[in-house]
Amino acid sequence: MIAIPQCLDFADARLTKDICEFYLRMLEIKNREIYLHSQQVANYSASTAAKLGLPASEVSQIKTAALLHDIGQLSVPNIILAKLPFLSTREQSIYKRHCIAGASMLENIPGFDTISDIIRAHHEKWDGTGYPKRLKGQNIPIGARIVAVPTIMTATLTPAPGIGKKLTPTLSSSCRTRQASILIRQ
């Protein structure tokens, strides 16, 4: 489900939906694992936002941002994506640009300011060690904090590309606990 801002007329809303579906289709063609990961993140994010009691319109925006959170990976060379998580410093620098690239793809679409802000900040961490802007605490949009948790959770519970193995349950739990502690205030 793609959230269409209510301020748009029917023609703009249809165009906006088509643009989002186009980006999702391109992501699916480029890397099906990332596309499926985005679907999982969207479902978990929407569920979390709803359980937090956020308004339905905000839940819908968070779900759309979660669906599109990795569209910036369309700009990352396949050879780098295939090596995840084992990247050189240079490759990490290229990979980390996907947040800004994804936000840039949507920020000029009417009504998508919040969604592009969430996409830009989905790798920020509560303690300020995230990227791309090293935002800290309450400066990270709530939607980005919500999207960040299932992003890490699904990444630790599914096989790593090229490895074909999941993390062990103990290691996976340890990773989630550590990551959650720097994503949300304790």
Language model features with spans:
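Histidine- and acidic-residue-rich, metal-dependent catalytic cores
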Residues: M1-Q186
